Regions:
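Short acidic, glycine/proline-enriched helix-loop-strand junctions
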Residues: 28-30, 44-46, 95-100
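Gly-rich Lys/Arg/Thr-decorated short loops/hinges at beta-loop-alpha junctions or inter-strand turns
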Residues: 13-18, 45-47, 119-128
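Structural motif
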Residues: 55-61
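A glycine-rich helix N-cap at a beta->alpha junction
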Residues: 37-52
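Acidic (Asp/Glu)-rich catalytic clusters
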Residues: 35-41, 64-69
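Histidine/acidic residue-rich metal-binding segments in metalloenzymes
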Residues: 61-217
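Short histidine/acidic/glycine/proline-rich micro-motifs that form metal-
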Residues: 21-25, 52-55, 81-82
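Metal-associated gating/positioning segment near the N- to mid-region
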Residues: 1-39
Length: 217
């Protein structure tokens, strides 16, 4: 937390939200309060999100009400997708009742053979399959619908696909309370960066095509 706060301030960020996918996982009040206590000693404003599921396994719900009361600003299993649609929907309903956001990492591993690189021309050149955009788009489509039906405030994290962008726009027009965010590298680089920078350009979700980049912008 301390070094993160220092680098955030150096980069011009005066308010940040810490994710819950840490060790230990922020899925209980003791860990949450410990993190918030540490954060309170820093020179920037630091909020803490709590996990949606215990140990980020997507199976057992945390006590959202108790965690919110203890200071959680929202809920996320950041970095790990919620594959069970019913579980995800119930989490949205609970978050809606508490008036807090749910943030979702959208990659269905069933479609992915190699993490970190887009399934496309670059992966073909390297002789691997990679991670196709449908891995993201399929979960974005599902969760946009769940957001519409639940009425929850839902954030689609680090969006990488142009189709995903259009899905969010479509469901926002239908009345869903949706938001999406993109990283600087996803709107400034493409899959071609892997050929130049190697593993430094591999990430989840991966850098995609120029068309995707333009749609994200």
């Amino acid at each position: 937390i301390h070094t993160g706060a220092k680098t955030s301030a150096k980069g011009g960020f005066t308010t940040v939200i810490c994710m819950a996918n840490t060790s230990p996982t922020v899925d209980n009040i003791d860990t949450l309060k410990d993190n918030l206590n540490r954060a309170s000693k820093e020179d920037i404003r630091i909020f803490q999100a709590a996990a949606i599921s215990h140990s980020l396994k997507g199976q057992e719900e945390v006590d959202m009400a108790a965690l919110k009361e203890a200071g959680a600003c929202g809920f996320t299993d950041d970095g790990i997708p919620l594959l069970n649609a019913e579980f995800c929907y119930k989490a949205m309903e609970a978050a809606k009742a508490l008036n807090v956001p749910v943030s979702l990492h959208e990659e269905d591993p069933a479609f992915i053979r190699n993490n970190g690189i887009n399934h496309g021309k670059v992966s073909d050149e390297l002789g691997i399959y990679g991670s196709p955009s449908i891995a993201e788009e399929s979960l974005v489509a599902r969760d946009c619908l769940l957001a519409l039906r639940s009425g929850a405030d839902v954030v689609i994290q680090h969006i990488s696909s142009g189709v995903s962008v259009e899905l969010v726009r479509t469901y926002k027009k239908l009345g869903a309370n949706l938001h999406a965010e993109a990283t600087p590298h996803h709107f400034s680089l493409t899959e071609d960066a892997v050929l130049k920078h190697g593993t430094l350009a591999k990430m989840n979700p991966p850098l995609r095509t120029e068309k995707d980049r333009q749609q994200i912008i």
